[in-house]
């Protein structure tokens, strides 16, 4: 974390948990060697600025808390690498990536980082008969006559590359947006998600 304060351009900054002296380019904190074994894909500050979340290529989610002596909480997930992360409240982050599905994580006041839920409810697959035309098309495209449905059960059909706030802000996000390599942009409403996913609450 570096200081981006520019003298005579920005207002004189107040002291923060990250430090009090902030000349431009000053290294405020460094978390290399915090246990992550892959390059960092995305970072996000909380609304207060006291917490910093990042996701790395080894499928790890990390949250550093400057107000608690730079304490770092980490969670090694079982998912494919995550490519984007964003705070949606002071204690909750949404991350997404190669699994094509946004996921909610919670970091409580003690620094315990936990996985809460996937936010994309899988669609029911439909069994159907295929026509002779589709059978020949499958032979040509996939070298098979079987109707192997390659459509994913998630809304996004390829990796999600960006998670961003759509409504309100990082203090109390109501809706967020995901965009992916499939060219799709999806708006997610937390009120709708909380009613459809049992036990889901944004802390």
What are these regions (language model features)?
Residues 1, 38, 58-62, 99-101, ...:
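Short coil/turn segments within WD40 beta-propeller repeats
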Residues 1, 52-56, 93-97, 176-180:
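Conserved beta-strand element within WD40/beta-propeller blades
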Residues 15-33, 118-152:
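Surface-exposed loop and turn segments in beta-propeller and other repeat-based domains
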Residues 34-36, 77-78, 119-122, 156, ...:
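Conserved GH/AH loop at the N-terminal boundary of individual WD40 repeats
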Residues 1-30, 58-73, 104-114, 142-146, ...:
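Per-blade loop-tip surfaces of WD-repeat and WD-like beta-propellers in eukaryotic adaptors/scaffolds
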Residues 49, 90-91, 169-173:
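Conserved loop/turn motif of beta-propeller repeat scaffolds
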Residues 166-169, 173-198:
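Blade-level signature of beta-propeller repeat domains, shared across WD40, Kelch, NHL, RCC1
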Residues 32-45, 79-87, 157-168:
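Canonical WD40 repeat/beta-propeller blade segments in eukaryotic WD-repeat proteins
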């Amino acid at each position: 974390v570096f200081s981006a304060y520019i003298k005579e351009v920005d207002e004189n900054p107040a002291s923060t948990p990250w430090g009090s002296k902030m000349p431009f380019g000053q290294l405020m904190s460094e978390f290399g060697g915090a246990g992550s074994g892959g390059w960092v894909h995305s970072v996000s500050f909380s609304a207060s600025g006291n917490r910093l979340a990042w996701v790395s290529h080894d499928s790890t989610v990390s949250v550093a808390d400057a107000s608690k002596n730079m304490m770092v909480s980490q969670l090694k997930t079982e998912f494919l690498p995550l490519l984007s992360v964003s705070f949606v409240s002071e204690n909750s982050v949404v991350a997404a990536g190669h699994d094509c599905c946004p996921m909610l994580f919670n970091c409580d006041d003690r620094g315990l980082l936990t996985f809460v839920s996937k936010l994309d409810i899988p669609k029911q697959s439909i069994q159907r008969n295929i026509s002779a035309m589709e059978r020949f098309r499958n032979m040509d495209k996939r070298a098979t006559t079987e109707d192997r449905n390659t459509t994913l059960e998630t809304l996004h059909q390829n990796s999600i590359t960006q998670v961003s706030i759509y409504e309100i802000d990082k203090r109390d996000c109501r809706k967020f947006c995901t965009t992916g390599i499939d060219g799709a942009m999806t708006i997610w409403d937390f009120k709708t998600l909380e009613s459809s996913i049992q036990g889901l609450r944004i802390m």
